[in-house]
Regions:
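Helix-boundary/low-complexity linker signature
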Residues: 1-216
C-alpha cells in the first residue's frame, strides 16, 4: 500500500475526493459512507491509504473470495449476497423517459439474440457495446439519434450516462460516477512525494459495473 494526500483548494467540500483504489481504513466503515460517496463534513485536507492492484491480482482476489472456506471469507460472501440483492433492485432501474428515448434501438440490437430480457451475460455485454459504438464511435460519425444529456454532447458525462442506462437495460448493474482523472501520461511526469495540481480540465465521468462476489 501507499498513501495519497489530498488538499482541496476550491472544489465542493460536501464530499471527500477519494482515490478509486481506497485501502481499508476508517473511511470504509458504514457510518462514513452513503450511496453517493464519502461524506466530507467540510474537511479540505486528508490522507488515504491506496492499493495498487493489476487485473491479474484482482482476478486472484475474486477467485479467493469465491472459493475460500476461511470463516472471514464465508462471512463476506454472506454479506455480499445480501448487498447484491440491493444492487439488483436499485441499479437495474431505467427511468421511463430514457426508455422512451432509447428502447427501440436497444431492442433492435437485442433482436439478433432474442428477447432483451433473456440474454446471456455475454450477449448483454455485446449488445451494450454495439449500441455504445453507434453512439460514440472511435472513428466516423455517430448515428443520428436522440440521447440523454444533450447539453453535454460528446463528453464523458454524456457517455457515462448513456452507458449506465444501456448496461442496466441489458441486465448489467451499473452506476454513473464522476470525479477527477489523472492519466498515466500526466502521472509519469511526477516523482513519488511530489504535489500535483488537479483542476477542472481533469473533471471526468465514467460508468462502473457490479461484479458479483467482489463489488464495483
Amino acid at each position: 500500500q501507499s498513501t495519497v494526500t489530498v488538499q482541496n483548494i476550491g472544489a465542493c467540500s460536501y464530499y471527500r475526493y477519494v482515490p478509486f483504489s481506497l485501502g481499508k481504513g476508517t473511511l470504509t466503515k458504514p457510518e462514513n459512507l452513503n450511496t453517493d460517496g464519502v461524506f466530507g463534513d467540510g474537511e479540505r485536507s486528508y490522507v488515504y491509504s491506496v492499493t495498487a492492484a493489476t487485473a491479474d491480482e484482482i482476478m486472484q482476489v475474486l477467485t479467493h473470495l469465491q472459493l475460500s472456506e476461511d470463516p472471514a471469507v464465508l462471512q463476506y460472501r454472506k454479506a455480499e449476497s445480501g448487498y447484491r440483492q440491493f444492487i439488483n433492485h436499485y441499479y437495474l432501474q431505467v427511468p421511463e423517459e430514457i426508455k422512451t428515448m432509447l428502447q427501440e434501438q436497444w431492442d433492435e440490437i437485442a433482436s439478433r439474440y432474442g428477447d432483451a430480457n433473456n440474454l446471456t451475460q455475454q450477449q448483454s455485454q455485446e449488445c451494450a457495446l454495439i449500441f455504445l459504438s453507434r453512439c460514440f464511435p472511435e472513428e466516423g460519425t455517430p448515428e443520428d439519434m436522440e440521447l440523454p444529456l444533450e447539453t453535454a454532447e460528446g463528453t464523458t458525462f454524456q457517455y457515462a450516462t448513456v452507458a449506465a442506462m444501456t448496461l442496466r437495460y441489458f441486465g448489467i448493474p451499473a452506476r454513473y460516477a464522476e470525479g477527477y482523472v489523472i492519466s498515466q501520461e500526466t502521472a509519469a511526469g511526477f516523482d513519488s512525494g511530489e504535489t500535483m495540481t488537479v483542476d477542472s480540465s481533469c473533471a471526468k465521468a465514467w460508468v462502473e459495473v457490479y461484479q458479483d462476489g467482489i463489488g464495483w
